[in-house]
Amino acid sequence: MSEVKKIATRDSYGNALAELGKEHENLVVLDADLAAATKTGVFKKAYPERFIDCGIAEANMTGVAAGLSTCGKVPFISSFAMFVAGRAFEQVRNSIGYPHLNVKIGTTHAGITVGEDGATHQCNEDIALMRTIPGMVIINPADDVEARAAVKAAYEYEGPVYLRFGRLALPIIHNESSYKFEIGKGEILRDGKDVTIVATGAMVSNSLEAAEKLAADGIEAKVINIHTIKPLDEELVVVAAKETGKVVTVEEHSVIGGLGSAVCDALAMKNPTPVMKIGINDTFGESGPAVELLKKYQLDAESIYEKIKNFVK
């Protein structure tokens, strides 16, 4: 049996930018001295005249992008999630969010799967921060196919978009020939009647694996992929909650303010349902291999399976 192909979504980001650059001369890419890591170097090599390296000055990069967007350009700013959502939050809020400018924020190295770089570089709070900015779209793709489609959709969308990419290579779960991406629309990847698993980003493939383990125990889990955390596909989540009666959210992010909180907000208003949030439990990350960190923070498939099995019982 052949192995499932795996690609890091940061690679998908760089490749998608280069592809879009062929078609759209108004697309410009800005980076903060991390083009090799964020993979925007692919775009830089193809279109050096449309690439701006702002150095280690993320706040300035954000302001430059805001200015470019008022001149007919569609800028994508790029750095680690910690350095844009964290360090440059004020500028993202005031220079991009407040005037609702057409700037795309492509961040990489989100979550604990940054690995050996450690807690200072592992941004587990970015989704929570970005959710508070009015009008900010938040996309967290699950694989290469979805990530490349998300970059294209972000370019076509008029307004600020926050894109979250990772360092860890992820299994490809979508068929490129048939996959259709739409901002704000989740998808059911697996049907089930006993519990609904709502997952995002790197946790989608682990959740699918956990669902297979649950099935062996006679527990049928519905698995929903939420690539767009804001605006959330509330209708899909509410209908699923009504069908299964229990919901589990899974994210490589703090359980405070991320996907789990968004789902709970929706269900509290429209269909109160027991919810278990699986994510980073109000703690910082640490240095270590990505796969080992997922195990320690109980975000690997086996841990997800065990938690859901106990929750359903």
List PLM regions with ranges.
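Thiamine diphosphate
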Residues: 1-164, 169, ...
